[in-house]
């Protein structure tokens, strides 16, 4: 049996997850990151994507996150998300509104900000393709 550790997923609105898990896959800015017990201490930024949480009971739950930070320690992991929701609760309208807001912000944005916003639009679009059935 795999070793377990504590995982918390927190958004400004609420605590979404606080439980003992065996594995968490995080959409880190540098790429997908699998966190397991006794992971080396790391702090990373999180891009919009899906967090997969494998519980000690063997179930896997998926959450859509819209950026944030992950604090990883050997005994636990805390993900502070800008916004997060269980994928079953993700509404295509909410996602489309986020994409449209980012596109609207592109108007008149500086080159540096424009690049970040274009990347955000691409990440949100990909997130929609992953979690919302066609």
UniProtKB/Swiss-Prot annotation:
Subunit info?
F-type ATPases have 2 components, CF(1) - the catalytic core - and CF(0) - the membrane proton channel. CF(1) has five subunits: alpha(3), beta(3), gamma(1), delta(1), epsilon(1). CF(0) has three main subunits: a, b and c.
Protein's name in the database: ATP synthase epsilon chain
Q: What does this protein do?
A: Produces ATP from ADP in the presence of a proton gradient across the membrane.
Assigned protein family: Belongs to the ATPase epsilon chain family.
Provide the Gene Ontology terms for cellular component. Answer: plasma membrane; proton-transporting ATP synthase complex
> What are the recorded GO MF terms, alphabetically?
ATP binding; proton-transporting ATP synthase activity, rotational mechanism
Ion transport is among the record's keywords = yes
Q: Record's superkingdom? A: Bacteria
Topology in membrane: Peripheral membrane protein
What are the protein's UniProt keywords? ATP synthesis, Cell inner membrane, Cell membrane, CF(1), Hydrogen ion transport, Ion transport, Membrane, Transport
Principal location: membrane
The family database entries (SUPFAM superfamilies) matched by this protein are listed as: Epsilon subunit of F1F0-ATP synthase N-terminal domain (SSF51344)
The protein's location, in the record's own words, is:
Cell inner membrane
């Amino acid at each position: 049996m795999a070793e377990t550790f504590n995982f918390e997923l927190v958004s400004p609105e609420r605590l979404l997850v606080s439980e003992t898990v065996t594995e968490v896959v995080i959409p880190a800015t540098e790429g997908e990151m699998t966190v397991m017990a006794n992971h080396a201490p790391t702090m990373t930024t999180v891009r919009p994507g899906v967090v997969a949480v494998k519980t000690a009971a063997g179930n896997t739950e998926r959450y859509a996150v819209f950026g944030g930070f992950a604090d990883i320690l050997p005994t636990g992991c805390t993900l502070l998300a800008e916004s997060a929701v269980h994928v079953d609760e993700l509404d295509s309208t909410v996602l489309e509104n986020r994409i449209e807001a980012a596109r609207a912000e592109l108007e008149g944005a500086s080159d540096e900000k424009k690049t970040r916003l274009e990347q955000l639009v691409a990440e949100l679009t990909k997130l929609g393709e992953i979690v919302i059935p066609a």
